[in-house]
Amino acid sequence: MSKRTIVDANTFFGFYPRRKVDSSLEALLQIMKENGVSKALTLSLKGVFYSYEEGNEETLRVCKNHRNLMPVATLDPRRFLGGRSEIESLLELGFKAFRLFPDVQGYPLNYSPVIEIFNCLDGLKAPLLISVGGRGDITAVSKLTCGKDFPVIIVGCFYSNLSEFIVSARKNKNLYVETHHLASPDSLEVLVNKVGADRIIFGSGTPLEYFQASYMMV
């Protein structure tokens, strides 16, 4: 039997200011090694809590030294003025995907700079991971990205808003869901039955979250 290839779409490294946790690069690499994770999309937490430009520089530097890490560029709409050229430059540097954190950085989804980022990504086919919070967020993301030509991966979907994702995903064929908060086996079964296994992206949130909690559900 061939060994399962594990790719984790949701990992981090760097200092996390909200609670005491070992979120160092070394911790991430050790968790990947212990659990047989072949590749991981990752980003520096500096880009989330401090400067997204400095965070992206650190992400790229680290990923160049570790071939099992794939760089994700953080974008902060509160400071984003570079337009499509900035996003194209990040892709040329080697970034594989983009990430928005409205839940952490405190901006609404129906926000002109966010809409500008969605428009800039259209046609580039690079995935966008976006964290959601309360009810209605998935609906808003789906409406704002429907018809655009890039994959949108919803991060932070719970069982309680699974129906919102399913209804939205039926209308928006570029919508996918990441798994780290889907903590019950039935949620994955429901997703497979309603939208198909190809719309489910494995992510753990490690090292901020416990890897096995996500992995055992898949």
Regions found by a protein language model. Name each.
Residues N10, M32, T59, C63, ...:
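Conserved, mostly hydrophobic/aromatic
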Residues N10-Y16, L45-G47, T74-R78, F101-Q105, ...:
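Active-site beta-loop-alpha junctions enriched in small/polar residues
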Residues A97, N110-F202, E209:
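Catalytic pocket-lining loop regions of alpha/beta-barrel enzymes
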Residues S24-I31, G55-V62, E86-L90, P113-I117, ...:
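A general structural detector for well-ordered alpha-helical segments in enzyme core domains, enriched
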Residues K39, G47-L129, K171:
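Active-site gating/metal-coordination segments in enzymes
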Residues M1-E57:
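An N-terminally biased module of ancient metal coordination in phosphate/nucleic-acid-related enzymes
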Residues R18-V21, Y52, G83, N110, ...:
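Alpha-helix N-cap/helix-start motif
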Residues R4, N35, R67, L93, ...:
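Structured loop/turn residues at beta-strand edges in well-structured enzyme cores
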